[in-house]
């Protein structure tokens, strides 16, 4: 059976790519930040998506897979570039801009594309192109991202994904693969991962540096989501937003404020690019 790639209007305007061989599909809204709103694997919908909130353009999105660029987290005091101070909103601007979308030549998935604009250069003074290839494989979603610096100066950046995974009950969740310690991003203090996992239903926002993949187990639905990292996109953030029954399992390249602190700060040399890889696997237990 062949794959399909078509534009649809219900329940909202979106593009849908599906692969019947794997009983899998994704929905994408390129004009809303290249947002992947749904990922279905073996017939199961895995992402949390608040449609009512999405339809209210005055509110930020809660759900899908928002794209974080050129920073992850906030940068409250701005940053210096070329002797001038610039300010960026939380998680950057990529999730707010329209992207273009195309079917990959081998039809294994779709390609999203974002380039700088006159407006973006007023707060991020660089010429760039970002290409994100999203491929559906058996029980997995593979995302590879190329970021090109088309400027004459080195381009600092962070990149991340903010996937919302729906769960049956945040009190019935197990997470494996995290280290013992993490940074509580609500107060920027080091704390125990185990203490944070115990209060997922109360709301958490913590960052860690795992040495292997991270697995999210839902004891009621029996779903398992595995985040497979590749350096430098190997920082993991866990975020919950009660009473929503979802857990965000987020791969970042760098912690918040890295453009100022230099902690895991990334730069792309002029006329060069970097390629980043992330895979999400779905299984049952």
Short names for language-model regions:
Residues 1-9, 84-137:
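Extended, loop-rich substrate-binding clefts of extracytoplasmic carbohydrate-active enzymes
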Residues 1-68, 75-78, 212-231, 272-284:
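Beta-strand-rich N-terminal accessory domains
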Residues 102-110, 135-140, 167-173, 218-219, ...:
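A short, structured loop/turn motif at beta-sheet edges
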């Amino acid at each position: 059976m062949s794959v399909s790639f078509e534009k649809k209007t219900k329940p909202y305007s979106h593009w849908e790519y599906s692969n019947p061989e794997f009983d899998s599909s994704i929905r994408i809204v390129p004009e809303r930040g290249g947002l992947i709103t749904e990922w279905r694997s073996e017939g199961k919908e895995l992402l949390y998506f608040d449609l009512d909130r999405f339809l209210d353009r005055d509110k930020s999105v809660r759900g899908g897979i928002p794209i974080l660029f050129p920073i992850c987290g906030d940068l409250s005091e701005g940053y210096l570039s070329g002797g001038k101070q610039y300010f960026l909103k939380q998680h950057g601007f990529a999730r707010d801009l329209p992207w273009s979308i195309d079917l990959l030549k081998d039809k294994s998935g779709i390609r999203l594309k974002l380039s700088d604009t006159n407006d973006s250069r007023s707060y991020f003074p660089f010429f760039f192109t970002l290409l994100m290839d999203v491929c559906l494989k058996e029980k997995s979603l593979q995302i590879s991202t190329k970021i090109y610096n088309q400027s004459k100066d080195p381009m600092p950046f962070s990149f991340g994904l903010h996937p919302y995974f729906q769960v049956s009950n945040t009190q019935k969740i197990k997470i494996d693969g995290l280290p013992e310690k993490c940074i509580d991003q609500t107060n920027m203090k080091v704390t125990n991962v185990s203490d944070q996992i115990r209060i997922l239903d109360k709301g958490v926002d913590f960052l860690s540096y795992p040495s292997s993949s991270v697995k999210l187990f839902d004891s009621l639905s029996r779903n398992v989501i595995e985040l497979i990292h590749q350096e430098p996109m190997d920082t993991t953030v866990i975020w919950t937003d009660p009473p929503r029954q979802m857990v965000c399992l987020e791969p970042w390249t760098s912690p918040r404020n890295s453009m100022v602190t230099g902690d895991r700060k990334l730069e792309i040399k002029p006329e060069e690019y970097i390629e980043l890889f992330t895979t999400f696997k779905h299984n049952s237990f």
